[in-house]
Regions:
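Alpha-helical segments in soluble extracytoplasmic regions
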Residues: 34-111, 123-135
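Bacterial N-terminal signal peptides that target proteins for export
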Residues: 1-13
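Bacterial signal peptide processing site
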Residues: 25-29
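Short, exposed beta-strand-loop hairpins at the edges of beta-sheets
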Residues: 116-124
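C-terminal motif of bacterial Sec signal peptides marking the signal peptidase cleavage site
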Residues: 20-23
Length: 137
């Protein structure tokens, strides 16, 4: 039996928040491992959003499903983007943190648009989200 997509999105959000809380707790700095895990989680959310956009554009998923699932993905990505904007890290990891935070903002914005996008827009969003997923790896 497959795991429902909403459960996967909720688990991903909980995992990302736990990692950021652990990494940033008590005024500490975000570790390289936590930053890499955050990028991996965002990459997964972007890839899932891209597949959702492709299916929506091809008429393989309903507009309601696309809207609801993209909202779940958006919430997870928006929370990660917010946390990354506030995060601190070592100077050596600063560029990676800024890049990951910028991509998190973009993924979040794309996922928010996806829920109400036309099929043409969904095709463009699929390309953008796949590119973001690849860049986050």
């Amino acid at each position: 039996m497959a795991t429902p997509p909403r459960a996967v999105a909720r688990f991903s959000l909980a995992l990302a928040l736990a990692l950021l809380a652990t990494a940033c707790g008590s005024g500490g700095t975000l570790s390289a491992k936590a930053l890499s895990q955050e990028a991996k989680t965002l990459s997964s959310e972007a890839a899932e959003g891209a597949l959702l956009a492709q299916d929506g554009a091809a008429g393989k998923s309903t507009r309601i499903y696309t809207r609801v699932h993209s909202e779940d993905l958006y919430k997870a990505a928006a929370q990660a983007a917010s946390s990354l904007q506030k995060a601190k890290t070592t100077p050596a990891l600063g560029p990676k943190l800024r890049r990951t935070a910028r991509l998190a903002q973009k993924v979040s914005a794309d996922l928010k648009r996806l829920g109400h996008a036309s099929r043409t827009e969904q095709r463009a969003l699929a390309r953008e989200l796949f590119a973001a997923a690849k860049e986050l790896k």
